[in-house]
């Protein structure tokens, strides 16, 4: 049986929320440790299921992982390249970073096809194109990807689609290849800079991370290092939206405001008062939310990952707001759930029209993916009465200790296993 969250809405929240390390960095930094030949220490990792799944996978490969609080000590010295069945790999989409890392270190890898949130077609063809350009032979046999290379040689690779996953994966494979690699039309996300920083600390030579052209000069060996992960800009943005929806003064700590320009701009346009500090953001209470139109784009544009949480807040806005997702046009599964709570929406192609303001009512809803889960939590906090959210495991894939964090600022939120309620 899956567990559920029970939230009694209508309370005004106040206090401080701490942002954890970036999920989208963590799932790449941990596989990147495979490339080193001595101990790698990663600090500030989020305590989420994806991270623990990756520790298990590294141990399956013969590595050792010591984990304490938010720090992991990874010793990749005795790792060997062995086929990774789809058990753990199926649990997370970002297991594809194991391909680049294992190819970079061992020149071969066998990996079951990755899992994670299902957001429509997100194929890994750009990753494979990059690996092939570096000299790997890639085949798909019985639902597993086989990668083999006699040697990896630097190449010029143009990505047809700006892809964070492909950019990082090619970086991982190229840092120990012979000669120079150039990735053109590379993604520019902060998480890419974070991975490049780790690799550089390990002895890699990388220029241009964070721009659309990344240049890598291959080296033979990489060594261990200490690295502190960047804060999670999507968790920070989710907390900002939540504070605007239900807060009466919420301070969000451990943030990098320059990573949050898209959401800061839109909340400002909606009339949300904010104080931006060096590494914290204070969100004040807001009486009336103004309607806005939003289009998601690749970084530094408005992130697709915050589109769903924002939908919940916009049920409070006066008039019709339009959200257009240019990245994942089918990312609107949460809307049917918020409609059960009384939300008024119209779907038009890759856009959703949100008509407000409406007072949401508690209901039974289901989180279909990670950010839909965040949207439903915000909707439940806004609603009159009690909301039951099923599919908690989706939420916990990306938000660590969400119940403790929200309870600490006054939310009435508990978890119950669905089995208990049947007795």
UniProtKB/Swiss-Prot annotation:
It is an enzyme of class 2 (transferase). One of its GO terms (molecular function) is UDP-N-acetylglucosamine 1-carboxyvinyltransferase activity. Pathway: Cell wall biogenesis; peptidoglycan biosynthesis. UDP-N-acetyl-alpha-D-glucosamine binds at residues 93, 122-126, 305, 327. Its EC number is 2.5.1.7. It comes from the Bacteria. It holds the Pfam family EPSP_synthase. The modification 2-(S-cysteinyl)pyruvic acid O-phosphothioketal is found at residue 117. Disulfide bonds: none annotated. Phosphoenolpyruvate binds at residues 23-24. The keyword Cytoplasm applies. Transmembrane segments: none annotated. It catalyses: phosphoenolpyruvate + UDP-N-acetyl-alpha-D-glucosamine = UDP-N-acetyl-3-O-(1-carboxyvinyl)-alpha-D-glucosamine + phosphate. It is found in: Cytoplasm. Keywords: Cell cycle, Cell division, Cell shape, Cell wall biogenesis/degradation, Cytoplasm, Peptidoglycan synthesis, Pyruvate, Transferase. The active site is at residue 117. Belongs to the EPSP synthase family. MurA subfamily. PANTHER family: UDP-N-ACETYLGLUCOSAMINE 1-CARBOXYVINYLTRANSFERASE, UDP-N-ACETYLGLUCOSAMINE 1-CARBOXYVINYLTRANSFERASE 2. NCBIfam families: murA, PRK09369.1, PRK12830.1. Cell wall formation. Adds enolpyruvyl to UDP-N-acetylglucosamine. This is UDP-N-acetylglucosamine 1-carboxyvinyltransferase 2. It comes from Listeria monocytogenes serotype 4b (strain F2365).
């Amino acid at each position: 049986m899956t567990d559920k969250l029970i939230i009694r809405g209508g309370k005004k929240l106040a206090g401080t929320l701490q942002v954890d390390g970036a999920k989208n960095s963590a799932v790449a930094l941990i596989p990147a440790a495979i490339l080193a030949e001595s101990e790698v220490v990663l600090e500030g990792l989020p305590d989420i299921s994806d991270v623990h799944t990756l520790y298990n996978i590294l141990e399956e490969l013969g590595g050792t992982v010591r984990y304490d609080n938010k720090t992991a000590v990874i010793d990749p010295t005795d790792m060997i390249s062995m086929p990774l069945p789809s058990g753990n790999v199926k649990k997370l989409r970002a297991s594809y970073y194991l391909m680049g890392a294992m190819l970079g270190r061992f020149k071969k890898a066998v990996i079951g096809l990755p899992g994670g949130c299902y957001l429509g077609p997100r194929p890994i063809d750009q990753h494979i194109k990059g690996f092939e350009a570096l000299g790997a032979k890639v085949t798909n046999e019985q639902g597993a990807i086989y990668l083999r290379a006699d040697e990896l040689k630097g190449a010029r690779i143009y990505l047809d689609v700006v892809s964070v996953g492909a950019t990082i994966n090619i970086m991982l494979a190229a840092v120990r290849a012979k000669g120079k690699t150039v990735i053109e039309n590379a993604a520019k996300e902060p998480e890419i800079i974070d991975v490049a920083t780790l690799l550089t600390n390990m002895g890699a030579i990388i220029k241009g991370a964070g721009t659309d052209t990344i240049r890598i000069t291959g080296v033979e060996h990489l060594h261990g290092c200490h690295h502190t992960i960047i804060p999670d800009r999507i968790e920070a943005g989710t907390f900002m939206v939540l504070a605007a929806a239900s807060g009466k003064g919420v301070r969000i700590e451990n943030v990098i405001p320059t990573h949050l320009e898209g959401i800061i701009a839109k909340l400002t346009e909606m009339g949300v008062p904010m104080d931006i500090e060096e590494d914290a953001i204070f969100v004040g209470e807001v009486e009336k939310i103004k309607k806005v139109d939003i289009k998601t784009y690749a970084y530094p544009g408005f992130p697709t990952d915050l589109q769903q949480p924002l939908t919940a807040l916009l049920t409070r806005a006066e008039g019709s707001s339009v959200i257009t997702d240019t990245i994942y046009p089918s990312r609107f599964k949460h809307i049917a759930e918020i409609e059960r709570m009384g939300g008024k929406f119209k779907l038009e192609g890759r856009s959703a029209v949100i008509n407000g303001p409406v007072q949401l009512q508690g209901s039974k809803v289901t989180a279909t993916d990670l950010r839909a889960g965040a949207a439903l939590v915000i909707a439940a906090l806004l609603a009159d009465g009690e909301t039951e959210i099923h599919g908690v495991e989706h939420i916990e894939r990306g938000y660590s200790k969400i119940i403790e964090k929200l309870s600490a600022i006054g939310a009435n939120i508990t978890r119950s296993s669905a089995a208990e309620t049947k007795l």
